[in-house]
Amino acid sequence: MDSVFKLEPFEDNYEVGEDLGSGHFAVVRKCIHRKTRQAFAAKFIRKRRGGGRKGAKMEDIVKEINVLRCMNHPNVISLHEVYDTKQEVILVLELVSGGELFDYISEKEALSEEEASAFIKQILEGLKHLHDNSIVHLDLKPENIMLLDRTSTKIKLIDFGLARKINDKDDVRAMMGTAEFIAPEVVSFEPLSLATDMWSVGVITYILLSGSSPFLGETLQETYHNITALNFDFDHDLFQNTSDLAKDFIKRLFIKNPRKRGSVNDCLNHPWIKPSEPREAIARRSAMINIDNFKSFMARKRWKQSMRVVSLCNRLTKSIQLRKSTDTLSSRNTLSSRNNLDEETTEEVNCGAWSPSSLGSPGHDPALDSLVVEQEQQDVQKLRHMHDAEHHDGDISATLATPPSFLHPPD
């Protein structure tokens, strides 16, 4: 193991606090260094053991660590140190506690293009640091653009789980990222490059200005088709207050050929980001983003996330109940013990926290069960955070009967 991986018990040096979030095979918790009292975010990544399918591959964990070690920029999250245990690798990261940029903007009553372009500039400056180090992020989206703290407008790029070093000689082809933000070359399984990130910047900018996602379809296939066909426009109702400079900035990123797409340096020197004439600065200052539609976009996004999680909880609960019936018919000798186990499991699912190992039953692949649960658990975690944010008492089990106010459909 790399000598920079610390092997002593993590708790010897840190006090572990509340959960900050969860993802695939990982959970992030706030921690306090015992001596310095400095706060960090600790990312606990479960290691894949042997031939199992639960946990992250060690090579992927090391890849993420190596990328983070190259990072040293005000707009990119920094890695403090790494611990290795038998079950987990723990990344001690800079604490970023200001929430998502888009959530911050949705709380404002108005936002000029001048302010919007300042946020995009910070994203570009962080991205330039990556690209100068030949690193492509591959998962740029609003959820991975955070504010340092609640009193700051400093942006931090986070989540380098898909990031990798890349150069012109590499022929990297991979289907990765979040559908509505991925570039045409990802959909077509063509070589990826630094330009792949730039397409995502275009999507983020489009949404920020209009409150609408340019390529999102009713289905995944429709979204992919819209991306590869460049099926987007600047709808008058959405962009009537948008400057031509901003539209030009986006159009230079929505180019199918990656070699012709605007680079991070091109974008930083674009007049929408860096005005060279007074009229360009005035155009930015007088134009406004579509804040009403942006608020509606964020409300719809939260609604869809919430309803998806409620649906997943219901499906998982029904699945467990069905397995209980199957177990009863297949083995009356173990009826009592299995019923106790399943009742505990069902209770945990309703609370949004469950153990994948407790879902096994005859005729099912436990490894496959755990993969499904790992993917769905992060959605449940998001729902719990939103539930807390709305100041509702109780747990997720209540939403299965009567959805709280934040689950009411947006207008």
Can you describe what each PLM-predicted range is?
Residues N265-N350, W354:
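C-terminal regulatory tails of eukaryotic serine/threonine kinases
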Residues F119-I120:
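Activation segment signature within eukaryotic-like protein kinase domains
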Residues Q87-E100:
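Conserved short submotifs of the Hanks-type protein kinase catalytic core
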Residues V16-H24, V28:
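Protein kinase glycine-rich loop
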Residues F44-M71:
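Conserved N-lobe beta3->alphaC-helix segment of eukaryotic protein kinase catalytic domains
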Residues V27-R49:
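Glycine-rich ATP phosphate-binding loop
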Residues E81-V82:
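A short, aromatic-enriched beta-strand patch in the conserved N-lobe beta-sheet
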